[in-house]
Amino acid sequence: CHNVIKQTNYQITNDETFRNRANLYLAQDKEKREPYSGETKVMHYFELLRDVVGFDKIKEKVVNPLTGRKIAAYYGCLLLRPGKVMAFDDPENPAIMEEFIRAIGAEPVIYPYRNECCGGYVALEDPDSAKKKSNAVTNSAESHGAELAVTACPLCKYNLVHNGSNIPVVYFTELLAEALGVKEDTNA
């Protein structure tokens, strides 16, 4: 999970005690492992698409624009929080997924529950609570005109789909592949 990796890297970089404990743990696998100090930049795929590839470049490469499709971006609670650590969009008023939706030719739907929790890992202990949270998200998206929802978190997708969403929920790479004209490999 991007959230766990990024938070761990942040702690290794900023907390000497944590860094020492992590390096002791890692050294168990290999005697001569170099200590890790957090020098790797952890990026989400959306950061890569926006900051390295560029949404303008993606827009240029679209061969199958998703024109007329109303898509609700679902951020959930793990993609952008804690904001100080994730630090690639505003956790209270995010825009990166809406920019992506526009780049592939669709219309983003703004709705109140787009950065609320879907139930996350709570689904393991309290499925009813996760179902209630997930349904609040998809019902909100649908009532604001969305015909489908897109997410960047596999756990969010699982919760939204398996808790009875009335609208389809897809992973963002599915929309990207569709817009770029990538054919599904049925032999994979």
Each predicted region: which residue ranges?
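Iron-sulfur cluster-binding electron-transfer modules in prokaryotic oxidoreductases
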Residues: 1-188
